Amino acid sequence: MPEKVGKCKYEGCNRKVLPNSKYCICHEKRDDKDIEAFNREIEKIMQDKEAEFYDFRGFYFPESFDFEVIYRHLKDRTFEKSVNFEKAIFYSVVDFKGAIFQKKADFNFAIFKRRINFKGANFEGETHFDGATFEGIAYFTGAEFQLAYFKGAIFSKKVKFINAKFKRVNFENAFFQKEADFEVAIFKDEAFFTSAEFQERVNFKQVRFYTEGNFGNTTFKGLTYFRDAIFEKGVIFRNAKFKEMSDFKYTIFKEWIDFVRVVFEKKADFSFSEFKKGSDFRYSRFEEKADFWDVEFQEADFGYTTLRQADFRYTRFRKEANFGHARFQGVEFDYAVFEKRADFLNSSVTKIISFYNTGFHDTFSFIDVKGKKHRLDFMDTEFSDRTRIGGGTNLERALFSGSTAELVDFTDAKFPEKIYEERLLEKKFHGQLEKDEEEYCPENWQEVSTVYRKLKQAHQRHGDYIKAGEFFYREMECKKKALREKRFSREWFRSFGYSFLKYSCGYGEKPGTVIRNSILAVFGFAFAYLFSNSINLSGNSAVRKFLQSLYFSTITFTTLGYGDIHPINDAGRVLAMSEAVLGAIFVALFIFVFSRKMMR
């Protein structure tokens, strides 16, 4: 009686098993199996006109398999029916170059052990590579996809989608262990790369996304290139991580972009890019240099963002720009232009934030900015009359040379006794200027005086006359120093007039100085009268004589002159006359200074 032959254990397969095996010739996972018998089974499938689809599910294609066995039954490598390679294992080199899949193509959980070639392939129906493993180099160069799924696919070697065209594609949770190249690819509909991971270099140069692209939660561990890419619709990078340098240079974003909570661990280069609509970078972290050189923004939101060594030079913000609560650790906005509201409320600064030659054409709020040893560079900055720098902001090392600071509202700003420009110039004259301070140091005292004048005008404009008076005092001090830059010149002699104003009345800002000098003058003349015996004093007590001298000095200084005590010699008359003139001057000076202060 002949031995009974069993059926293949693979689910849904009715073929006979091989001797000493549980599987048929198609599903037997042996590379030395009978290739001729295997080819005959392939040909049966290809010749079966009744079958709804080409069924290669779970097939094991040995290394010696030649895909011409399939193509000899097709016209121009065109699969007119659906084809199913689900869970198939390819030990042979896979050659679908130029193939056309008119219906559904299913490669879910397939394993490709060798090189895979889909160059120029056309997938006209649904295409599924979900969970597939590509252990060899995968070529999809020039391939066209209608609806493609690569969810959870693993690419162990290089994969090339250069010049590929996708109507809609999903790479969710895909894992790229080596280089992935999508250069010049076109995504006509939605493209999902959510939670994908790129272990090495990934290239999206000159890629075009016609609809939304989604890279949310994606991890880029290698160099990442989106240079010259065009995003016609919105793009999402929310919670993405860039472990190495990322290049978005010359990229065009035509709709809203979402970079919320993105982490850039290395340099991020967005220079010369265009953001046609809004851009959202809130809560993102740029842990190394962030380059936004010569970028064009519409609405830009960098709220709560951390920026280290960020470069926004020559950048244009066409609409509102929000940097509220951002953390700056060395940021340059030199030559940037803010056409609408710019908000830096509650941000914090370490190292430097530079607005050199920056233009603020609308509201600029630099309020309650935190930081101590930071440098704020507003040199040559063009402020609008809707600018406010204050609310507790520390201006210990702020620079305003050449700016329109007279338009700024500095309410509650924290100014030092001497502004940074003055301290730098003092250090220069004492030979103590540090190398990194040289570029910020003013040329002369006149430049510093101009800064004080503008700060004075700014505080006068907003009703803070006390602070305005302090800046006027420093302005006059710097003017005096400017006159003394060349010794024994005409200006040098003029500077002593400033010295008189300083020590007599504090340049008209210190009535207390006038009172102090008046008291000193009265006591000084009292001693002069006493020791020169130039007035008629009565009594033998030295104290009594001094009090009489002080009394006479006081009434002479105030030009009252009761006559009960009078000079008795020429020296006394000269002293009395001098004191009367000096008293008249100081009384008038006190009235002027006091009235000036009170009228404010």
Q: Model-derived features: where do they sit?
A:
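Hydrophobic alpha-helical transmembrane segments of multi-pass small-molecule transporters/permeases
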Residues: K454, V514, M577-A580
